[in-house]
Amino acid sequence: MIHLAREIAKAKIYPAVDLRTSRSRLIETGAVAEEHRVVAEQVRRVLAAALWNVGDPPEAAADRRMVERARKLQNYFTQPFFVAEPYTHRPGTYVRRDEALHTCRDILEGRYDDIPVKAFYFAGGIEEIRNRAAAVQ
């Protein structure tokens, strides 16, 4: 069940899927691999803790890292989908599910801590993200 949110669209996050209220029957019924379920739960937990329940800015370095990783995940989910072309004016790209899963896991584990958050915005796969980061530096 996918829920779209106007406030997410106003932030120019497309597709404007609200991960707080959206659910996957495939994950809930165990139709996906265990790794997929675990990574999806970790992503949801990090996004909820770092972006949706934020009160004061994080003080500890670990908290700041978690918020930055959550922002990278949020931006990574703005992959240039074909259905979003009318809104983003960017051509759609295809990212394989296993690549998306591994990239999410690697973001959570800090493997891309050296890549700026903005490099993940409307990027396709991790190679495009790395190329953007290299072009900025």
Model regions and ranges:
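Conserved catalytic/coupling modules of large nucleotide/cofactor-utilizing molecular machines
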Residues: M1-Q137
